[in-house]
Amino acid sequence: MSVKFNVVERGKPGSPETPKKYYPSIVASGKVNQRDVAKHAAEMSTVSIADTAAVVENFLQIIAQELAKGNIVQLGEFGSFWLRTETEGADEAESVRASQITNVLVRFTPGKEFQQVLDTIVFEKA
């Protein structure tokens, strides 16, 4: 099993005079949706596709709800989801307001077993 990559040319953001360099950029081999995940999980167990799909849907909703409460969602050896923000700065601590949060991003940190799978990926040029 391998992951393919293309070569892309990029400059340094904010520094147009810096020479551009070439970098590998992963090429997706396809997409897997919730139904595909549910079907695959059902094939690996004694649970029906419909029941598995319902569990997957609930699971995804719970992750979003817990993140919206400000919680880190730890899923054992799979990893953790947490929120990060993009913000605008203020000159003084007293003048910091919620309106300075310009974007909320979801981050994922893989757990040990997940990372071990990632470490086995073989890359090849597309």
Regions found by a protein language model. Name each.
Residues M1-A126:
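Strongly charged
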